[in-house]
Amino acid sequence: MANLGCWMLVLFVATWSDLGLCKKRPKPGGWNTGGSRYPGQGSPGGNRYPPQGGGGWGQPHGGGWGQPHGGGWGQPHGGGWGQPHGGGWGQGGGTHSQWNKPSKPKTSMKHMAGAAAAGAVVGGLGGYMLGSAMSRPLIHFGNDYEDRYYRENMYRYPNQVYYRPVDQYSNQNNFVHDCVNITIKQHTVTTTTKGENFTETDVKMMERVVEQMCITQYEKESQAYYQRGSSMVLFSSPPVILLISFLIFLIVG
């Protein structure tokens, strides 16, 4: 880890040193220097975007920007944006006044999906989060009747689990036990309110299905937890701290 931090330090020092030198180099074509900040003005080639109507940019009587008598931006008598007498946007005389009304905010489906994938905290459940949707596992129960019953009714069983952060549990068994209990309880209550009841066979199968999904959720959350811990260790190492301090010095200086 220390070797990695040292190599990162060397790489960023070389990069930012070059950028720091570039920032200190004088720029040609400054104010009152030989070069022009806007090549094309005052040269034989003319401006890349010549003004229309005979007037220069920002000059009166020729359609300049922000000046009267020429249809400038935001000025009367010339059809400016948002002003009367000229059919501006959102004002009298225009044909598109409704365009000035603010549009209603729309909920992004990507944001909703991202919240579900990351594990959204469920209100009223004491800090439990709802995991992302999973494919229901293929489970064999030991006899043809239950196997067939499961295949025909698996759509009635949960495909998401409720869980708490893994750092609140001492081991996987405690996480899975709590995850199974709260998930089956919530799913049963929700389904019962819709007028559907579960048999003992349904409960038995739900326990097996939810247990497999809770194990999968634990493995996923544990991996993410250890990755976050590794990142914290990396950024707390002395070489990385020195690197960050040096970058701040270059940016401020």
UniProtKB/Swiss-Prot annotation:
<feature type="repeat" description="5">
    <location>
        <begin position="84"/>
        <end position="91"/>
    </location>
</feature>
<feature type="propeptide" description="Removed in mature form">
    <location>
        <begin position="231"/>
        <end position="253"/>
    </location>
</feature>
<feature type="glycosylation site" description="N-linked (GlcNAc...) asparagine">
    <location>
        <position position="197"/>
    </location>
</feature>
<dbReference type="GO" id="GO:0005794">
    <property type="term" value="C:Golgi apparatus"/>
</dbReference>
<dbReference type="InterPro" id="IPR036924">
    <property type="entry name" value="Prion/Doppel_b-ribbon_dom_sf"/>
</dbReference>
<keyword id="KW-0325">Glycoprotein</keyword>
<feature type="binding site">
    <location>
        <position position="79"/>
    </location>
    <ligand>
        <name>Cu(2+) 3</name>
    </ligand>
</feature>
<dbReference type="InterPro" id="IPR000817">
    <property type="entry name" value="Prion"/>
</dbReference>
<dbReference type="InterPro" id="IPR022416">
    <property type="entry name" value="Prion/Doppel_prot_b-ribbon_dom"/>
</dbReference>
<feature type="binding site">
    <location>
        <position position="85"/>
    </location>
    <ligand>
        <name>Cu(2+) 4</name>
    </ligand>
</feature>
<feature type="region of interest" description="Interaction with GRB2, ERI3 and SYN1">
    <location>
        <begin position="23"/>
        <end position="230"/>
    </location>
</feature>
<comment type="similarity">
    <text>Belongs to the prion family.</text>
</comment>
<dbReference type="GO" id="GO:0051260">
    <property type="term" value="P:protein homooligomerization"/>
</dbReference>
<dbReference type="GO" id="GO:0005886">
    <property type="term" value="C:plasma membrane"/>
</dbReference>
<feature type="binding site">
    <location>
        <position position="69"/>
    </location>
    <ligand>
        <name>Cu(2+) 2</name>
    </ligand>
</feature>
<feature type="region of interest" description="Disordered">
    <location>
        <begin position="26"/>
        <end position="108"/>
    </location>
</feature>
<keyword id="KW-0186">Copper</keyword>
<feature type="disulfide bond">
    <location>
        <begin position="179"/>
        <end position="214"/>
    </location>
</feature>
<feature type="lipid moiety-binding region" description="GPI-anchor amidated serine">
    <location>
        <position position="230"/>
    </location>
</feature>
<feature type="region of interest" description="5 X 8 AA tandem repeats of P-H-G-G-G-W-G-Q">
    <location>
        <begin position="51"/>
        <end position="91"/>
    </location>
</feature>
<feature type="signal peptide">
    <location>
        <begin position="1"/>
        <end position="22"/>
    </location>
</feature>
<keyword id="KW-0034">Amyloid</keyword>
<dbReference type="InterPro" id="IPR025860">
    <property type="entry name" value="Prion_N"/>
</dbReference>
<comment type="subunit">
    <text>Monomer and homodimer. Has a tendency to aggregate into amyloid fibrils containing a cross-beta spine, formed by a steric zipper of superposed beta-strands. Soluble oligomers may represent an intermediate stage on the path to fibril formation. Copper binding may promote oligomerization. Interacts with GRB2, APP, ERI3/PRNPIP and SYN1. Mislocalized cytosolically exposed PrP interacts with MGRN1; this interaction alters MGRN1 subcellular location and causes lysosomal enlargement. Interacts with APP. Interacts with KIAA1191. Interacts with ADGRG6.</text>
</comment>
<feature type="binding site">
    <location>
        <position position="61"/>
    </location>
    <ligand>
        <name>Cu(2+) 1</name>
    </ligand>
</feature>
<feature type="compositionally biased region" description="Gly residues">
    <location>
        <begin position="52"/>
        <end position="95"/>
    </location>
</feature>
<feature type="region of interest" description="Interaction with ADGRG6">
    <location>
        <begin position="23"/>
        <end position="38"/>
    </location>
</feature>
<keyword id="KW-0677">Repeat</keyword>
<keyword id="KW-0640">Prion</keyword>
<feature type="repeat" description="4">
    <location>
        <begin position="76"/>
        <end position="83"/>
    </location>
</feature>
<feature type="binding site">
    <location>
        <position position="70"/>
    </location>
    <ligand>
        <name>Cu(2+) 2</name>
    </ligand>
</feature>
<dbReference type="GO" id="GO:0005507">
    <property type="term" value="F:copper ion binding"/>
</dbReference>
<dbReference type="Pfam" id="PF11587">
    <property type="entry name" value="Prion_bPrPp"/>
</dbReference>
<protein>
    <recommendedName>
        <fullName>Major prion protein</fullName>
    </recommendedName>
</protein>
<feature type="repeat" description="1">
    <location>
        <begin position="51"/>
        <end position="59"/>
    </location>
</feature>
<feature type="binding site">
    <location>
        <position position="63"/>
    </location>
    <ligand>
        <name>Cu(2+) 1</name>
    </ligand>
</feature>
<feature type="repeat" description="3">
    <location>
        <begin position="68"/>
        <end position="75"/>
    </location>
</feature>
<keyword id="KW-1003">Cell membrane</keyword>
<dbReference type="Pfam" id="PF00377">
    <property type="entry name" value="Prion"/>
</dbReference>
<dbReference type="Pfam" id="PF03991">
    <property type="entry name" value="Prion_octapep"/>
</dbReference>
<feature type="binding site">
    <location>
        <position position="78"/>
    </location>
    <ligand>
        <name>Cu(2+) 3</name>
    </ligand>
</feature>
<keyword id="KW-0479">Metal-binding</keyword>
